[in-house]
Amino acid sequence: MNHQLQISDRAVASVFKTEFMRMWGDGPGGLQNSQFGRGKGEPNPARIDLGEAAITVLFPPHGRQHPHHGLQTIANELNKASRRIDIAVFVFSAQTLADTLQQRIKEGVSVRVLADPGFASRPFSEVLDLLGKALPDHECLLERHNRPFSEPHEKVGTPRLARGDKLHHKFAVIDNKTVITGSFNWSPAAAHTNDETLLIIESPQLAKHFSHEMDRLWRGAELGVTARMQRNLERQRIHCGAGEQRTPIPAG
């Protein structure tokens, strides 16, 4: 389960060409001048106006203190929502974004979240946080700074997919007018380690298409703690008890 966008615009193409050339360097010429990861210099977001729409392009990774790293960029958009946030993602393991959603829910914003069934019940899944659950890993340790919701959020679940399929979307729709998408999983690795693409597209017309996809996936989705999650929770409860939170590794 995925999607594809075609954007016919020279300015947007130029931004992507610049990113490609950073990584290509001189290609197979033998010089060690290809730039990947943080070696790209942590480029700032580029905004391009497209008439009735606008697109912001960000190429991670960035350092954790960079003001425009990917997770912060997403959080900024979530904080702009006044009515509704719809999210469909493959991986959701960023505690900061779970914390942001918790605050938006408290402020009355309607939030729906769907995640891939295979990922949602893993120990580092923030889907579990939204459902008020904590799952120790194979070492009986909990994620550092883990903060499950004190009141489980009802509008969280996993779509029903054909055997072998995955929910590979990485999108959110804000107030039916802004779309967050790209290759960027909602994870610290995507923000700080991987070479990724994150797009913020301001277009009610495009948002309508993504909202239709969200509604399609939502119909028939399993909401709340699924049987698969419950089995994992029970298995780890027997093996680990409540678990212990991870502690920082001492420097040096």
PLM region spans:
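PLD-like (HKD) phosphodiesterase/transphosphatidyltransferase domain
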Residues: 43-119, 251-252
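PLD/PLD-like phosphodiesterase catalytic module centered on the HKD motif
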Residues: 1-40, 84, 94-252
